[in-house]
Every structure is written in C-alpha cells, then in structure tokens.
C-alpha cells in the first residue's frame, strides 16, 4: 500500500510541476460519435503517428493515422494538423434498422481515413486538448463515406 501511495504522489508531482511544451507522446481519451483512446507519437517536430481505438455500435475500430502539424494563429501552443490513414473494425450492426436493413447483422469494416484538427498544449500542466474531424470511407463492410467522425480529445503529454 505504501508503494502505491508513493507512486500516486510521484505521479501527481510530475503532473503538476512538469512544463508541457512541445511533446513527444500523448495518451488520452477521445469522445464524439465514437468514443475511445488516442495515442499520438511524434516522429519529427512536425509529423506524428496516431492510433485510435474506438467503440461504436457494440463494436471496436482500430485506426492508424499519419499527421502533419503546423503552428496555428501565430501561437506556439495551438497547432493545426491534417493527415491520412486507414482502419479496420468489427461492428455488431446495432443501428437504425430503417437505414441498415437487418440490425442483427455483424460486419468487418476496412477503409481509409482523413483527419483535420486543432490542438492546444497547456504550459502549466502536461495536458493537451484537441478537436478534429475524421471522415472515413469503408471499402469493405458498410461501404461508403462516413463524415460523422468529429471528436474532442484530452491527452496526458510527455
């Protein structure tokens, strides 16, 4: 129990006293039409890989993205980004039966994704917040354009 308490105390100290400038890696939550976990890692000062694991309609989707970041509105803390990638997922088909047909149908989905967003990294705490739009096109399973991929993310950055 003492080790657990010490671990929590050290984590809080790192959280409150670190200076969150540019970051290498961010891990956090993503919420929107689908909710999940986001992990972003920079491979250069302006490019990053992001992995999103999200759930929707009793299923799960894994998305991998390559993103280009740039300074937004002449401030160091606010960045815009765009990118592309792909996804694979497994859905249970639990949606509107009027649109989908048989609501008991399960499906595997495979497709491509784009992303366009803004994110802000706080100076005082290692937290990053972002908003993005991530349209997708499924080639396999529920084929077609999915333009409802907007989300809000909060990440711990280090």
Put a short name on every predicted segment.
Residues 7-15:
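Bacterial N-terminal signal peptides
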Residues 19-24, 46, 71-79, 122-127:
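Short loop/turn motifs that connect adjacent beta-strands in outer-membrane beta-barrel proteins
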Residues 23, 33-35, 58-62, 78, ...:
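Residues that define the transmembrane beta-barrel architecture of outer-membrane proteins
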Residues 29, 37-41, 64-68, 84-86, ...:
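Residues on the lipid-exposed face of transmembrane beta-strands in outer-membrane beta-barrel proteins
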Residues 64-65, 93-100, 141-148:
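Outer-membrane beta-barrel translocator domains and adjoining extracellular loop/strand segments
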């Amino acid at each position: 129990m003492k080790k657990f308490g010490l671990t929590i105390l050290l984590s809080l100290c790192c959280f409150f006293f670190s200076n969150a400038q540019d970051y290498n890696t961010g891990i956090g939550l993503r919420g929107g039409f689908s909710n999940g976990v986001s992990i972003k890692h920079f491979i250069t000062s302006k490019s990053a890989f992001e992995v999103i694991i999200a759930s929707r309609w009793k299923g799960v989707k894994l998305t991998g993205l390559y993103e280009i970041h740039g300074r937004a509105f002449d401030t160091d803390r606010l960045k815009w980004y765009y990118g592309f990638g792909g996804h694979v997922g497994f859905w249970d088909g639990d949606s509107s039966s009027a649109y989908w047909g048989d609501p008991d149908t399960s499906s595997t989905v495979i497709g491509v994704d784009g992303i366009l967003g803004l994110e802000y990294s706080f100076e005082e705490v290692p937290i990053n917040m972002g908003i993005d739009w991530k349209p997708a096109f499924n080639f396999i399973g529920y084929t077609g354009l999915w333009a409802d991929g907007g989300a809000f993310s909060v990440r711990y950055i280090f």
